[in-house]
């Protein structure tokens, strides 16, 4: 098969592209940035999803599209770019794929369409109402609608995957990581909260600062530690490849992520023990993050079995962290 992987320079897209090449497929990338992938079976279009000519060049001659690229930002200043990349961009990539008579189109949506941070019931299944509370979540829901529309009006098969939060294991203990830095480390968290303009959170976090880097256990205003899914990129790739090939995936919407959520009350002390970093705890204003999303549908329908629970990811994260210290 020849497969177009959008977001081929990104975390998930670059991994999936390499995996497909390893399985003997031909792969084309499509991203704003070059992927750095070097293989005779790989070519790429460097361009913007909302550039129709680039999208058409990317789609021509491929059997399937994995639309894994998107712009992720929660900053108000990025709003226009967010909608252009994730809504207009997805529409244009979809239309190019349909015009090129692509067989199957797999779309990377997000748990933020529910939203997972404020669920009406748990575990969150695919039947939970989709009522996003962030502009990013809105762009993903609009993307889903565009995918469903194309699935109705063209013969192209479509699959929607609602992604869990996703990390490479090596990112978990990297204070410079876009997600894991502010999630687990005090100094990046202070900078993040300053960026969001959350003065009270900044004040509480700064009061814990002992001048050296520390891990931070985040709890809500009642002292309940955060809980959320964090899924390894390798498990996400397994689910994406099932969506690409499985007959029962067609027309489906599936939550894709780890089976169990990560309890910060468990993982932060384990991180501190394994790294020797100091651990502080903070109660931030608000209800906080505390969710469990069900992956039962993709397990039961497509046979998805994740292999990288957080404990296994953490072992690898500690090795990467130790290497960075020397
Ligand atoms: P990533 O940021 O590592 O990669 C996204 C890629 O898309 C980047 O290489 C970027 O250059 C490219 N891109 C962005 N805007 C573009 C545009 N307008 N035109 C062309 N290329 C563009 O993200 P990731 O972690 O690999 O995420 C993959 C997918 O999963 C995305 O669709 C994301 O929205 C979704 N998702 C990710 C998470 C997560 O926690 N990582 C959670 C839920 C959903």
Give each language-model segment a name.
Residues 149-228, 233-235:
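NAD(P)-dependent short-chain dehydrogenase/reductase
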Residues 65, 77-105:
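NAD(P)-cofactor binding segment of oxidoreductase domains
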Residues 92-135:
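Conserved Rossmann-fold NAD(P)-dependent oxidoreductase catalytic core, especially the SDR/UDP-sugar
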């Amino acid at each position: 098969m020849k497969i177009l992987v959008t977001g081929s320079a990104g975390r998930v897209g670059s991994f999936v592209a390499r995996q497909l090449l390893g399985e003997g497929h031909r792969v084309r990338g499509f991203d704003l940035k070059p992927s750095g992938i070097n293989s005779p079976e790989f070519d790429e279009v460097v361009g913007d999803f909302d550039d129709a000519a680039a999208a058409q060049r990317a789609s021509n001659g491929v059997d399937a599209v994995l639309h894994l690229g998107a712009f992720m930002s929660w900053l108000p200043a990025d709003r226009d770019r967010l909608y252009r990349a994730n809504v207009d961009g997805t529409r244009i990539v979809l239309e190019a794929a349909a015009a090129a008579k692509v067989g199957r189109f797999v779309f990377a949506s997000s748990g933020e369409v529910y939203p997972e941070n404020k669920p009406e019931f748990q575990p969150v299944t695919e039947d939970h109402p989709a009522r996003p509370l962030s502009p990013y979540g809105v762009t993903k829901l609009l993307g889903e609608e565009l995918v469903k529309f194309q699935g109705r009006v063209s013969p192209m098969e479509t699959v929607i995957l609602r992604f869990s939060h996703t990390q490479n294991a090596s990112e978990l203990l990297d204070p410079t990581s876009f997600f894991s830095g502010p999630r687990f480390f005090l100094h990046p968290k202070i900078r993040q909260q300053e960026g969001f303009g959350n003065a009270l959170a900044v004040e509480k976090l700064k009061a814990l600062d002992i001048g050296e880097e520390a891990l931070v256990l985040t709890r809500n205003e009642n002292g309940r530690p955060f809980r959320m899914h964090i899924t390894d990129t390798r498990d996400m790739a397994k689910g994406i490849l099932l969506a690409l090939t499985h007959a029962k995936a067609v027309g489906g919407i599936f939550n894709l992520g780890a089976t169990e959520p990560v309890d910060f009350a468990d993982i932060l002390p384990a991180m501190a023990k394994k790294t020797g970093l100091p651990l502080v705890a903070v109660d931030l204003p608000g209800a906080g993050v505390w969710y469990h999303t069900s992956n039962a549908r993709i397990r039961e329908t497509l046979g998805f079995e994740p292999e990288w629970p957080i404990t296994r990811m953490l072992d690898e994260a500690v090795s990467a962290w130790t290497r960075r210290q020397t």
